[in-house]
């Protein structure tokens, strides 16, 4: 059932999360590197290897929200500092069954390197995990993937190579939620349509699209503004 993402209704008095708020993220080799990264409204929780979270620096690290890249066995996740709000795993397709059985103390996003994208997404959602969407997949695959995620409770994360791909992901997620043509949204994303979303509709999109990992979040945020989608 499509979700009505109304464009013109007046917003409520509460301020839900904006469409770009804390959307972008990147990988950092160490927690210190994540702490030194520039801050921006559009930049969210950094990705840091779990193996780097055993000797965290004092001070602001205590309140830092991070995503733990799962590079240690799940049974070795006690005593991490700071405690990850989400975990992330890159998984070869032949090890998908192992990933499906992993239990960690926070939501887990799994990027599978090959295989049928929507079929893999269904398996991960069924296991309670969030699928990861890699860049460069065909529009038909992405549309089928989003048809799975639009009505799942896990959401998904994605990786993008530039601001254009981030814009397309946002437009496609909106289209999937509304029951519109996802392929058309991917091919010709309309930033003006996205900026007209009321706050509640933008928040609904972000319940599905959790984060987008890019190489240079500040540059991508600037490029998104140049494409007509400033942070708000």
Segments the model singles out, each with a brief description of its role:
Residues 2-131, 143, 152, 191-232:
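Phosphate/adenylate-binding glycine loop and adjacent helical scaffold
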Residues 125-187:
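Catalytic alpha/beta core domains of metabolic enzymes, predominantly
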């Amino acid at each position: 059932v499509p979700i009505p993402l109304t464009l013109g209704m007046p917003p409520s008095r509460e301020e839900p999360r904006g469409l770009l708020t804390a959307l972008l993220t990147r990988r950092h080799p160490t927690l210190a590197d994540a702490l030194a990264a520039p801050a921006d409204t559009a930049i969210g929780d950094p990705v840091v290897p779990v193996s780097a979270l055993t000797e965290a620096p004092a001070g602001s690290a205590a309140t830092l929200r991070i995503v733990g890249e799962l590079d240690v066995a799940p049974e070795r996740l006690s005593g991490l500092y700071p405690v990850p709000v989400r975990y992330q795993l890159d998984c070869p397709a032949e090890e998908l069954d192992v990933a499906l059985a992993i239990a960690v103390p926070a939501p887990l996003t799994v990027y599978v390197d090959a295989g049928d994208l929507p079929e893999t997404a269904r398996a991960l959602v069924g296991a309670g995990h969030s699928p990861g969407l890699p860049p460069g997949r065909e529009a038909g695959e992405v549309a089928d993937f989003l048809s799975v995620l639009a009505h799942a409770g896990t959401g998904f994360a994605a990786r993008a190579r530039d601001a254009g791909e981030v814009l397309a992901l946002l437009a496609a997620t909106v289209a999937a939620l509304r029951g519109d043509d996802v392929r058309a949204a991917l091919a010709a994303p309309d930033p003006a349509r996205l900026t007209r979303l009321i706050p509640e509709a933008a928040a609904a999109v972000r319940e599905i699209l959790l984060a987008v990992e890019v190489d240079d979040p500040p540059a991508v945020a600037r490029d998104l503004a140049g494409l007509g989608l400033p942070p708000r």
